[in-house]
Amino acid sequence: MADQAKLGGKPSDDSNFAMIRDGVASYLNDSDPEETNEWMDSLDGLLQESSPERARYLMLRLLERASAKRVSLPPMTSTDYVNTIPTSMEPEFPGDEEMEKRYRRWIRWNAAIMVHRAQRPGIGVGGHISTYAGAAPLYEVGFNHFFRGKDHPGGGDQIFFQGHASPGMYARAFMEGRLSEDDLDGFRQEVSREQGGIPSYPHPHGMKDFWEFPTVSMGLGPMDAIYQARFNRYLENRGIKDTSDQHVWAFLGDGEMDEPESRGLIQQAALNNLDNLTFVVNCNLQRLDGPVRGNTKIIQELESFFRGAGWSVIKVVWGREWDELLEKDQDGALVEIMNNTSDGDYQTFKANDGAYVREHFFGRDPRTAKLVENMTDEEIWKLPRGGHDYRKVYAAYKRALETKDRPTVILAHTIKGYGLGHNFEGRNATHQMKKLTLDDLKLFRDKQGIPITDEQLEKDPYLPPYYHPGEDAPEIKYMKERRAALGGYLPERRENYDPIQVPPLDKLRSVRKGSGKQQIATTMATVRTFKELMRDKGLADRLVPIIPDEARTFGLDSWFPTLKIYNPHGQNYVPVDHDLMLSYREAPEGQILHEGINEAGSVASFIAAGTSYATHGKAMIPLYIFYSMFGFQRTGDSIWAAADQMARGFLLGATAGRTTLTGEGLQHMDGHSPVLASTNEGVETYDPSFAYEIAHLVHRGIDRMYGPGKGEDVIYYITIYNEPTPQPAEPEGLDVEGLHKGIYLYSRGEGTGHEANILASGVGMQWALKAASILEADYGVRANIYSATSWVNLARDGAARNKAQLRNPGADAGEAFVTTQLKQTSGPYVAVSDFSTDLPNQIREWVPGDYTVLGADGFGFSDTRPAARRFFNIDAESIVVAVLNSLAREGKIDVSVAAQAAEKFKLDDPTSVSVDPNAPEE
């Protein structure tokens, strides 16, 4: 009733009820309720006599007049610094709050002690002790009442846990009996113990049955959660799985929200009406070094930002002990102080005491000082933040699940290090504090009510005991009952997925037979490969094309009419090309994820689709095609997270190569993406030259991912080009295993002259073939051609053998695969690709002879292909000179032959080859 009176309302009048503070400043004192009611009655009368449109018009005119008269109006994107949900609208709390509080404190203790014990002498592996301490209620309300496990009839929720709060999840699993004390003592010691350890953060790669979603580095969690929620809807709209009763929760830090990935895609959640998504931002006002916003207020900033992007915003600022004070705040003085106090001051308050708060907060106004005149300093000190109030948090979560047609963000005000004691709570240095002193331990124990004696703590301050009351304790039974009712323990990851039928390789025979006299780019060959797979009924609906607004560039527009572009709202307009065969078609059941100019979101979709086999038990195969320059260079961190999450699928780096994308210039022309990709162990990198190679790679990739008895966690990165080239038919007796492992002998040179070898990949194969012809015709040299489909695979194989030999010097680790392959021929070796020399140089150690590497080192630039290739000396003529030079070093020909060839071909003059006979016509 207090809230209703504060709003000037009559409880029986449905036009004047307590309301959710959603975009208006509703927590204001009403100095004349009678006049307020007259205005309300006038509005009611207008609505009865006229229409909502008329009422809207008049309200807007009133706002216009108020602005003209310089009436200070609140911004519609933010509300007062108070709880969004009025006390009178809070639901009944359904659990046993005291019971839950007891084991919440035990979990908080064990989480901190786990990190503390990890700093024992000889270990000292770090950890975050304060984040979970302050966020514990945010998680425990969820675990006890909202988060649904894998066995829930609706399928279970997906929870993105804040990375730095991982100790709390381990501590809870210990209370549940899923982890042992020994497991906790293995925190951050994954390989140094025989029995293994547990990773620092949520890393599925490190705990395959536990963690589902990697949320570090910071910023990835928010973005991936949005696209996970969207992919859930995608599966539902396409009829693959009913996800209507599944919810995505993302727990984030307020400092983390400064990452571009944290905020940069929130509009997508609103555009897609993702009411299956809730962000919970732990607003402890601190980042790693200091306040998130010292002079202003991060909660208010985030409220405006999210509300402006179309989200529902719920603020949980103050705990229940503030309710009475706010009720007495008849003239709004307390709310005014709350509004005007900066985050820096709020942090300082919690680093002092109640007397300080009385003087420097309530003492700012005589009216607020009077509000607390009968409270002790201790009572003032104990006034809690909203994120520590179980009932306030429960009300926010319940409201979030009831919100329809838009996502929700909950902004929960907390104290970093809450409960750890005065030396930790709200301190700037708390991020770097990894252990507690003996006095800190005793104070922490007392505040949490842990039944551990001084003697136990003093025995070895480095190893204070964990606490567990035993499996038969009522608290443990209650905790387990709550999880059983909600569908099982969390976090949990499973890999029980429906099998898919991998079509036979013969399905791709049309791609493998070549293009005849027609020249086609390997990009088009890739599109044709997947188009053939789309015709297979057992596989077609499991393919997920992902495109960042370049479908027409890649020749994928032919998929628009048949597969359609996914849009949950359908297509409520007539497309400008509606009368064309390849018209732009959107539909709720569309298969293509067209992400716009948005590589970050595209990779997030790739992750959601590529991990669906574990998240949803549905094997999906994403094929994300993009400008290769904007893949690993732009979104490498996300692809790293994809590997951590054990995603499966295809990354297709189109318009690849430093010289192949004509004219685009320095920022577009990719000469190093395979080098970057080589650093990611979850990715196998290929640079195929021919269509039949692509067909083999794609088929083998799908089979490795989902073939019978396979299930490899592998991502294929395949570079493909936009330059049309001849596509030969698959040779008889093709060395298929060589193709997959990274190199095979494509052709042998003819004649009786000196022998040499050219190793080529990608579009570089065409220059190698031309060079071989010149060498044979003009210099009598027999040039063998090797197709190097994967320099990276070859280097990894060699490195693995080196490591095996290092660890067991007496054992035979075997010969590197590339060495064995190259021994089929003799003579020097010259490698060429449209990438930097770093790529072919990865195998130098295992090449059994003189080895020269040509590559496109340095920045790209705008020009023709021939000019660029002459500039970088990777064209056919440069290869010829490199081969001749190698033969001269071996004493087989005179060096003057190479010198004359270099002068003849003008290798230092790009102007001599400025015309491109294969340039596309505009």
From Swiss-Prot:
Domain of life here? Bacteria
Q: Which keywords does this chain's UniProt record carry?
A: Magnesium, Oxidoreductase, Pyruvate, Thiamine pyrophosphate
Show the Pfam families listed in the entry.
Answer: PDH_E1_M (PF17831), Transketolase_C_1 (PF22613), Transketolase_N (PF00456)
Q: Which GO terms describe its molecular function?
A: magnesium ion binding; pyruvate dehydrogenase (acetyl-transferring) activity
Write down the required cofactor(s). Answer: Mg(2+); thiamine diphosphate
The record's catalysed reaction(s) read: N(6)-[(R)-lipoyl]-L-lysyl-[protein] + pyruvate + H(+) = N(6)-[(R)-S(8)-acetyldihydrolipoyl]-L-lysyl-[protein] + CO2
> If researchers knock out this gene, what phenotype do they report?
Cells lacking this gene display no PDH activity.
Which Enzyme Commission numbers does its entry carry? 1.2.4.1
Q: Which InterPro entries does the record associate with it?
A: PDC_E1_N (IPR035807), PDH/Transketolase (IPR051157), PDH_E1 (IPR004660), PDH_E1_M (IPR041621), THDP-binding (IPR029061), Transketo_C/PFOR_II (IPR009014), Transketolase-like_C_2 (IPR055152), Transketolase_N (IPR005474)
Role of this protein: Is a specific component of the pyruvate dehydrogenase (PDH) complex, that catalyzes the overall conversion of pyruvate to acetyl-CoA and CO(2). AceE has reductase activity with pyruvate but does not react with 2-oxoglutarate.
Q: Self-association or partners: how does it assemble?
A: Homodimer. Part of an unusual ODH/PDH supercomplex, consisting of AceE (E1), AceF (E2), and Lpd (E3) together with OdhA (E1+E2).
| Protein name, entry field | Pyruvate dehydrogenase E1 component
Q: Which organism is it from?
A: Corynebacterium glutamicum (strain ATCC 13032 / DSM 20300 / JCM 1318 / BCRC 11384 / CCUG 27702 / LMG 3730 / NBRC 12168 / NCIMB 10025 / NRRL B-2784 / 534)
